[in-house]
Swiss-Prot record:
Source species: Deinococcus deserti (strain DSM 17065 / CIP 109153 / LMG 22923 / VCD115)
UniProt cross-references to PROSITE patterns, sorted A to Z: PAL_HISTIDASE (PS00488)
NCBIfam families noted in UniProt: hutH, PRK09367.1
PTM per Swiss-Prot/TrEMBL: Contains an active site 4-methylidene-imidazol-5-one (MIO), which is formed autocatalytically by cyclization and dehydration of residues Ala-Ser-Gly.
Protein name according to UniProt: Histidine ammonia-lyase
Length: 499
């Protein structure tokens, strides 16, 4: 991939997860050089410019002598690299490397091309700085995590390479690279940004789209297993309230359910209408769809943005302090997605109850053969309920909390990284809950006696290739984990969509 002015989520995923190599375009390199020239002019002159020849945060009014400008940037990195917690996953770090390079490549930060080259070299070599997960307050960007990233560039800290965590200087030497000696503005250019938030959010958004499709499939399978009505999913129904997500969800449900033999078999039954968790799937799942669409629009802007401060304008030679580093757009988006994904899990768990509670259907209690001797999927619903309840706490918006920092110079922060990390937890839980629903729905279909809709039937048969029918109680966790892998890999959804 050639890094220039734009970066899509699809390109991001190709680099971060599929390790597509990245190189800097010639035009991007030219932009970087032009911005650097402005910094060199400032260094040679008498003008006081924040972050170039002054201190940082509350120390912005302290002028730093020219002979100490390199030390200033070095001090910035080592002092700010004080995050804590478990190391971030490699894919999150890869996303940070890519997004930081992308932002610098837009040519308004003033770092030298060598800085971007080393970021991309680490990325392409799959040499990943070890970055603690906690420490960002989301303004000025993700300072502490990005300082740990920058630490590796100067030969300090640790790098995960070849499956081992080793001293950064040792890995750089093995790969034939010299540690950077940061020059004026470069330390600040590396750490002022929203790249942790952006990386977490992009990865979660990609996975949430896949989960949404799988949740639609799970809902369709449950509808079939419970002999539910297809009429609420008709185009004429959702067309009277045509939110885009609801329209799309109903279309997908109809595709999964087409040519069902189950629906005609109960056409004359006396049931008037189904529970909300079945009947209102287009409206509930559709609202999540629309939230994901909005998040995609936010990321499209963010991936083409400069989140540094101060900003360099090479055409005029101006250097302007602003607030592009503030994570609020991403923080609010992460919080919205937390709720949207949590609701997918919430309604999925309620469909599990519909499948397992004998008072709500004609199915055996907990889908257990010889109930009493066997407990069936009784505790599977407990697990789903536990995860849904945990999500309710995690879904509390992180962005409504702000703690002033830097002696009140930075008096409002976004907490966006906190929200984005919570989003990943919620998403992981939701993937498990939907997997539990699929496990229950597949077992319920064993009692159907008719073929389900084409998409549902294909998914059911694929599940049965990995998870056999429950004949008696057994150790169910391995079954759930195998099914969860079908969900998270996208394999199950692909089979249903291609049927």
């Amino acid at each position: 991939m050639i890094l220039d002015t734009t970066l899509s989520v699809e390109q991001f995923i190709a680099v971060v997860r599929r390790h597509e190599p990245v190189e800097l375009s010639d035009t991007a390199r030219s932009r970087i050089v032009r911005a650097r020239a402005v910094i060199e002019q400032i260094v040679d002159g008498d003008q006081a410019v924040y972050g170039v020849n002054t201190g940082f945060g509350k120390f912005a009014s302290v002028r730093v002598d020219r002979a100490q400008l390199a030390q200033l940037q070095h001090n910035l990195i080592v002092s700010h690299a004080i995050g804590v917690g478990e190391p971030l996953p490699a894919e999150v770090v890869r996303g940070m490397l890519l997004l930081r390079a992308q932002s610098l490549a837009l040519g308004h930060s003033g770092a030298r091309p060598e800085v971007v080259d080393l970021l991309l070299a680490l990325l392409n070599a799959q040499a990943h700085p070890v970055i603690p997960a906690q420490g960002s307050v989301g303004a000025s960007g993700d300072l502490a995590p990005l300082a740990h990233l920058a630490l590796s560039l100067i030969g300090l800290g640790q790098i995960e390479y070849g499956g081992q965590i080793r001293p950064a200087a040792e890995v750089l030497n093995e790969l034939g690279w010299k540690p950077l000696k940061l020059q004026a503005k470069e330390g600040l250019a590396l750490i002022n940004g929203t790249q942790l938030m952006g990386s977490l959010l992009a990865l979660a958004l990609h996975d949430a789209w896949a989960l949404l499709g799988t949740a639609n499939l799970a809902a369709a399978m449950t509808v079939e297993a419970l002999s539910g009505s297809h009429r609420p999913f008709g185009a004429e129904v959702v067309g009277l309230r045509p939110h885009p997500g609801a329209v799309h969800t109903a279309e997908e449900l109809r595709r999964f359910l087409r040519e069902s033999q189950i629906a005609p078999s109960h056409a004359s039954c006396g049931k008037v209408q189904d529970a909300y968790s079945l009947r209102a799937v287009p409206q509930v799942h559709g609202a999540t769809h629309d939230a994901l669409s909005q998040a995609a629009r936010v990321l499209a802007v963010e991936f083409a943005s400069v989140t540094d401060n101060p900003l360099i304008f090479p055409d005029t030679g101006e250097v302007v302090s602003g607030g592009n580093f503030h994570g609020q757009p991403l923080a609010l988006t992460a919080d919205a997605l937390k709720v949207a994904v949590a609701e997918l899990a919430s309604i999925s768990e309620r469909r599990c109850e519909q499948l397992l509670n004998p008072a709500l259907s004609s199915l055996p209690g907990f889908l257990a053969p010889e109930g009493g001797l066997n407990s069936g999927f009784m505790i599977a619903q407990y697990t789903a309920a536990a995860l849904v309840s945990e999500n309710k706490v995690l879904a509390h918006p992180a962005s409504v909390d702000s703690i002033p920092t830097s002696a009140n110079q930075e008096d409002h922060v976004s907490m966006g990284a906190h929200g984005a990390r919570q989003l990943r937890q919620i998403l992981d839980h939701a993937q498990t809950v939907v997997s539990i629903e699929l496990m229950c729905a597949a077992q319920a279909l064993d009692f159907a006696g008719f073929r389900a809709g084409i998409g549902v039937q294909a998914a059911y048969e694929h599940i049965r290739g990995a998870v056999p029918t429950m004949q008696v109680d057994r150790y169910f966790q391995p079954d759930l984990l195998r099914l969860r892998e079908l969900v998270t890999s996208g394999d199950l959804l692909r089979v249903a969509q291609e049927a």
